[in-house]
Amino acid sequence: NKFNLELLDIWYMACIDSSLPEIYLQTSEKLVPQMLNLDIDEIGVNFSKGCYPGQEVVARLHYLGSAKRRLFTFKSEAELNIGDSLYCASSKTAKVRGNRYKGSGIILNKVKFNSLFHCLATLDVDLIENEITLNNEHGPTLKIIHNE
């Protein structure tokens, strides 16, 4: 059986266009449902029933606070990898630790499509209007496509 990689890329692109994230080893245990927009209209999380690991944290964030990170779609000419960090050197959250900035987001899914890399990534919501770079403050720039 041969897989048609072109069709697989079309599938991955459709998932990215639809903001349907997949969790991989590189990104597991780094996210809560709100970062993936699964709390919006309760499409992925029901806050009125169920019991699951982490439910208390997820519910507390829903009822008492607001998500500081959300899921966004980006594109770039540079190669992207799942688990890569997003940076915004001008942000208040970009705290210097030695010579390194704290990441402001993480890449969850990616695909190369029509000679560009497209990805779903979490990002601090107050940074969507700023220049976002990959892996460090001097890395390649990512452009936000939409933020639904």
At which residue positions do the language-model features occur?
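Glycine-rich, small/acidic residue-mixed loop/short-helix segments
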Residues: 36-43, 59-148
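Helix N-cap / beta->alpha transition motif
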Residues: 1, 24, 122-126
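Short, well-ordered alpha-helical segments in soluble proteins
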Residues: 3, 20-24, 40, 65
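A generic local secondary-structure boundary/capping motif
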Residues: 3-5, 47-49, 108-110
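Acidic, low-complexity central loop/insert segments
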Residues: 1-21
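A short, contiguous structural element within a folded domain that forms the immediate neighborhood
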Residues: 24-49, 57-61
